[in-house]
């Protein structure tokens, strides 16, 4: 027994010597401790049972006995006793280690239990904090106010800052940062806790509500936010601010300071002029590209007039006012609907400028004409595409659905075949329904919505021409101001921003005329002489109607097209009783209009140095017993010196002695006689290819100018009969064609004469002293005998109590003969002497 124990201990010691790894020792110790906890009785009784090794049967070793081993046997016994004592000591040390590990494990378990208790308490504390979705910080629940309209929560600091920013930028429809639900004003008051911001909020809310009222008018005084709800005050437009200490009087219509002796347009024009002068003097008022904001980037809201800045970042043109909530288009500045950008209004969703008038009209005509063809083409393509495409789409969807599943091929193919067959049956029905509904909708849009939207916006470019049919205007409104600088305009048109004083507001007496003209293709309008632009004057004479309109452009290099339409329908027997309204647009500030006696006289026809000319066609009808009055208006540019031409006629003379004047040369003439009615058609053309005729006319003028006599208007006043005649001879006579006239006589006593007469001067001291040299007046007459001389004609005009009676002496000198196409034309000299009695 003792030998077995010694052998076991020796084997155990050998095992200890072999297993010197501390990790393996610890694992074995843990295993032993576990066995002890399980309550093994055999391990507790034996001291050596602490080490449980598996019983391994080893093969018996063959012993070899030698002579030396016999002599060393005693020494081995002593060594074994020593090893036994060492094994006992090792077992004791291992047991001490086990006891220490057990105590450590118990302490670890105790610390784990205490730490678990601490973690539970910490988790309970962490559960009381919530993360803010705005600042991403964790705060306690009491820092998250409850909102009435939604369940989202944010910390009070973030909400307060959010509300401050929204109110300071006048956005009063404040919604939740995480959804679109709006805040209740009570919640806003509780979160802000700021009386000043709440007053601003309430003021913006009130302003937003009042702006929607069409009868609300805000006081125009600075720093006055008082509003007047003026219901039914259109007939009495004078309003007074009711705020204490203000009392500002303003107009109901234009919403500006009260203007007692002016119309709204005149007051607006005066304000625009003063604003323009201040802008010129102070460069800090006007916005420029250097300051970072262009004038096109700042526009007022069409409803509340609050100024809005649009960033030039390629954003869309659908704008929403932050003050009143008005949705409008940035290009046309009009309140828009859902179909605004789909209709041919010319406004694009992302563009920087609207379409031109020409492009809009072409788009409209193309839509109206090509809509049936386009719709039929779309329907013809859609029907087969739907019939073929729907089954293919259904088959692919079913195949993709069954592709990744454990389904047999037979079942999958059956499902695909069934779906395709069903879709083949259904697809024609779907195509028919789609085309049957879509085609009427498209036709209704093209022929219903498009014309209505165009007529409502006034952008169709089609207007009535004084009962003479339909007129289509192709001139581009947006290109008029090309090349000009930013002009300060007080919500007026470009024409109103210029110096356009309206002189006289009389009725035309039934005389109707329509003449719209813009400058021809000119690159150098400023090449015309300065004396024309500085000394030009427009005469509104009795018996005539001169209507001038300014096209309103500050351009130097402009490319516009001339379009003239004249309707002449008035027939009268006398010359008196007519008045005209003239709008001056010249650069000169001292240009004036004088009402004087006489017939309608012509003005200047300047030509560009590069040969650009203005072409006008006028059709005149006359009857033997009636005389026709013509009225026209021309639209000229600021930099050019083109002047309005007027044609007229005189009556009240004996039959056979009367003469009619014409202000343009005739290029073509024909003889037509229809039942006693005489019809004359003429076309005025100014060309530069008649150099030989120009030289002849210049020689004639030079010879006649030396013989012309200058009559006196009074004892102390200089000549008035020769004003501005040199300009006419230099610009008009130098480029005119040879005059061709024809006349068909209904009776031997009826004669018609055509004359080219220069304009009468304005009676002004500074103009009379600088009047140019005299020029002869060429008269082309065609009578039966070509020898009749006009007698003295008296034209009298009464104005108030003062009578001015100029006497015109007409007599003819030597006749100039010219043969052209077997027609004889006689050019006579005309000398005019004007005498006045005041």
Curated annotation (Swiss-Prot):
<keyword id="KW-1133">Transmembrane helix</keyword>
<keyword id="KW-0863">Zinc-finger</keyword>
<feature type="binding site">
    <location>
        <position position="332"/>
    </location>
    <ligand>
        <name>Zn(2+) 6</name>
    </ligand>
</feature>
<dbReference type="GO" id="GO:0005737">
    <property type="term" value="C:cytoplasm"/>
</dbReference>
<protein>
    <recommendedName>
        <fullName>E3 ubiquitin-protein ligase RNF19A</fullName>
        <ecNumber>2.3.2.31</ecNumber>
    </recommendedName>
</protein>
<dbReference type="InterPro" id="IPR044066">
    <property type="entry name" value="TRIAD_supradom"/>
</dbReference>
<feature type="region of interest" description="TRIAD supradomain">
    <location>
        <begin position="128"/>
        <end position="351"/>
    </location>
</feature>
<feature type="compositionally biased region" description="Polar residues">
    <location>
        <begin position="630"/>
        <end position="662"/>
    </location>
</feature>
<feature type="binding site">
    <location>
        <position position="241"/>
    </location>
    <ligand>
        <name>Zn(2+) 3</name>
    </ligand>
</feature>
<dbReference type="GO" id="GO:0000151">
    <property type="term" value="C:ubiquitin ligase complex"/>
</dbReference>
<feature type="transmembrane region" description="Helical">
    <location>
        <begin position="368"/>
        <end position="388"/>
    </location>
</feature>
<feature type="binding site">
    <location>
        <position position="251"/>
    </location>
    <ligand>
        <name>Zn(2+) 4</name>
    </ligand>
</feature>
<comment type="pathway">
    <text>Protein modification; protein ubiquitination.</text>
</comment>
<feature type="zinc finger region" description="IBR-type">
    <location>
        <begin position="199"/>
        <end position="264"/>
    </location>
</feature>
<dbReference type="GO" id="GO:0005829">
    <property type="term" value="C:cytosol"/>
</dbReference>
<feature type="zinc finger region" description="RING-type 2; atypical">
    <location>
        <begin position="301"/>
        <end position="332"/>
    </location>
</feature>
<feature type="binding site">
    <location>
        <position position="304"/>
    </location>
    <ligand>
        <name>Zn(2+) 5</name>
    </ligand>
</feature>
<dbReference type="InterPro" id="IPR031127">
    <property type="entry name" value="E3_UB_ligase_RBR"/>
</dbReference>
<feature type="binding site">
    <location>
        <position position="155"/>
    </location>
    <ligand>
        <name>Zn(2+) 1</name>
    </ligand>
</feature>
<comment type="similarity">
    <text>Belongs to the RBR family. RNF19 subfamily.</text>
</comment>
<feature type="binding site">
    <location>
        <position position="179"/>
    </location>
    <ligand>
        <name>Zn(2+) 2</name>
    </ligand>
</feature>
<feature type="binding site">
    <location>
        <position position="224"/>
    </location>
    <ligand>
        <name>Zn(2+) 3</name>
    </ligand>
</feature>
<dbReference type="GO" id="GO:0031624">
    <property type="term" value="F:ubiquitin conjugating enzyme binding"/>
</dbReference>
<dbReference type="GO" id="GO:0005813">
    <property type="term" value="C:centrosome"/>
</dbReference>
<keyword id="KW-0677">Repeat</keyword>
<keyword id="KW-0963">Cytoplasm</keyword>
<dbReference type="GO" id="GO:0006511">
    <property type="term" value="P:ubiquitin-dependent protein catabolic process"/>
</dbReference>
<feature type="binding site">
    <location>
        <position position="340"/>
    </location>
    <ligand>
        <name>Zn(2+) 6</name>
    </ligand>
</feature>
<dbReference type="GO" id="GO:0008270">
    <property type="term" value="F:zinc ion binding"/>
</dbReference>
<dbReference type="Pfam" id="PF01485">
    <property type="entry name" value="IBR"/>
</dbReference>
<dbReference type="GO" id="GO:0061630">
    <property type="term" value="F:ubiquitin protein ligase activity"/>
</dbReference>
<dbReference type="InterPro" id="IPR002867">
    <property type="entry name" value="IBR_dom"/>
</dbReference>
<feature type="binding site">
    <location>
        <position position="150"/>
    </location>
    <ligand>
        <name>Zn(2+) 2</name>
    </ligand>
</feature>
<feature type="binding site">
    <location>
        <position position="329"/>
    </location>
    <ligand>
        <name>Zn(2+) 6</name>
    </ligand>
</feature>
<feature type="transmembrane region" description="Helical">
    <location>
        <begin position="424"/>
        <end position="444"/>
    </location>
</feature>
<keyword id="KW-0597">Phosphoprotein</keyword>
<feature type="binding site">
    <location>
        <position position="254"/>
    </location>
    <ligand>
        <name>Zn(2+) 4</name>
    </ligand>
</feature>
<feature type="region of interest" description="Disordered">
    <location>
        <begin position="700"/>
        <end position="721"/>
    </location>
</feature>
<keyword id="KW-0206">Cytoskeleton</keyword>
<feature type="binding site">
    <location>
        <position position="259"/>
    </location>
    <ligand>
        <name>Zn(2+) 4</name>
    </ligand>
</feature>
<keyword id="KW-0472">Membrane</keyword>
<keyword id="KW-0812">Transmembrane</keyword>
